Amino acid sequence: MTTKKLYFLSISIIILVAISIAIHITLNSNTKTRLTNDSQQQIDTIIEHDLQKGHIPGASILIVKNGKVFLNKGYGYQDVDKKVKASPTTKYEIASNTKAFTGLAILKLAQEGRLNLNDAVSKHVPHFKMNYNGQNETITIKQLLAQTSGIPSDITSEDAVTNKNNRLNDVTRAIMGDELHHKPGEEFEYSNMNYDLLGLIIQNVTKQSYTQYITDHWLKPLQMKHTTFKQTNYKSKHDAIGYELQGSTPVVSKPEFNLWDTPSAYMMTSTEDLEHWIKFQLNPPDKYKSLVQQSHKNLSSTIGEPNANPYASGWFTNNDEHLVFHSGTLDNFSSFILLNPKQNYGIVVLANLNSEYVPKLVEHLNTQIVNHKRYSTVASILNQYKDQFNIVTVLMTTLILLAFIFSAYRAWQMRHGQILLRRSKRIAVLSWLTLCLCIAIALILYALPYLILGSNNWSFVLTWLPIEIKLALITTLIALFSTLIVILLFLHTKITKT
C-alpha cells in the first residue's frame, strides 16, 4: 500500500511541475508584438468585471499607445433611467485631473516671464495673507504647485466659506489670516486651495477669467472642442449623470458645488477630447516638450503621507515605474489618468460614480499593457485547447466523486467498527509530509500568476481566463486536495480482521 501511495504522490508532483514548466517555456517563446483580438477581449472582460464589482453605472475608457488609440469606448450607461449608453463623447466631471491643466498653465506663464515660480502669492493676490504660529508667512507659487504651502486640506470645509463665497477672490478673502498646518515649504499636504489660488493668479496675471484663459490657450489649440467647466447642475445631452451608492444601488446625485473650486476640480470632458491631451502629454510638439517634461518633474516628496508618491505640477509621479498619474474624486464622479512617457502609453478612466474600483481598474489595465505579450500568448494557447480542458474538468470531477465516495464509505466503515485507526511514528511522519506537500502545492498555485505573468494575483487573472480553463483549474485543485484526503485515510486506517 505504501508503494502505491508514494507512486501516486510522485505522479501528482510530476504532473504539476510538468504543467508549470510547459507554460513557462511557452511564455518565453517568441510572441507577436502587436495587441491581438484576444487582448481586446481580455481588456473588455477586465473592464466589465471591475465596473460590475464597483457597481459603476457607466464609464468611458481610453488607452493610447505609441501615438495610436488602442481603445476609446464607453461601458454601461451615462444615464441609467433613460438608458443612454456611455460613449467616447460622454462628458464627465474629472475632479482633480483638472489640476494638471492649471499646473501647466502656470508653468507656461512662468516660461513667458509673466510670473516667477518663486514669486510670493501676495505679489499677484495682494490681499492674500496666512499665518503660522501667529506670524505672517510668505507662500510662493512653487509651493502651491508642490502642495507644500502648509494650507490645510480641510480649510474650505466650513459652511462660512463654502456656501457664502462662490468666487475665487471671495474665498481667498474668507481664509485671510487663517493658520497654516505647516511652515511653507517643509511638508506636503494635499489641498484643493493650492490650485484654486493658482487659478486666481492666472486670472490676475492674464486679465482673463480662469476658464476663458484655459479654453483659449489650451483647450482650443488642443482641439478639445467639447471640454467645458461646470457652471450648474444642469445636464446637457452628452453629460453623464452622477451617482452615489445606497447599499449596492447607484442613485442619482446632484451635490452642491463651488465655482471657486473650478481650477482644482470642475473641468468636464470626454475621452474623445482627452485623447488630444494624452497624446500631447506623451509626445508634445518641440516648442512644448521642455514645458511638459517640467510639469512631470517632482516638486515635493509626500513624506507627510504614508505610501504616497512625489508630487509634480498637478501630477503624482512614480519614478521607479516611470509613471505620471492623478486620480479625481467627487461625491458622484471619479476619474484616473495614468501616463508612462518612457513606454509611450496612457490610460484614462472616467466614471459617473465615486468608486475605489476606478484606480483598481487602471492598475489592471496598466498591468495588461505592460504584460500584453504574455497575456496574448497565454490566451491564444489556452483557447486552442478548450476541448482538452473540458476533458480535464470531466476527469477531475470524476476523481472528486470517487474520492468523496471512498471517504464516505470509509466513514461508514468506521462508524460500524469495520476499520481501526493506525498509530505509529512512521504514520505520523508520512502524515506531516503529506500536509507539507499540501501546503507546498497551495503555495505554488497561489504564486503561479506572479511566477508566470509577473506581479499579478488570481483574482485579476481569473477575470480574463475563459470559463473552460477556470473550471479545469478549480476541479483540478479540488481533485488534488481530495486525493490528499484519501491518502491520509489510507495512512491512518486499516480494515479489521473478521
UniProtKB/Swiss-Prot annotation:
**Major place of residence:** membrane
Keywords for this protein: Cell membrane, Membrane, Transmembrane, Transmembrane helix
What InterPro entries does the entry give? Bact_CellWall_Synth/Modif, Beta-lactam-related, Beta-lactam/transpept-like
Q: Where in the cell is it found?
A: Cell membrane
Q: Which Pfam families match?
A: Beta-lactamase
- Which parts of the chain span the membrane according to its record? 6-26, 389-409, 433-453, 471-491
Chain's role: Its precise function is unknown. Has no penicillin-binding activity and is not involved in methicillin resistance.
Name this protein carries in UniProt: Protein flp
In the UniProt record, the gene name given for this protein reads flp
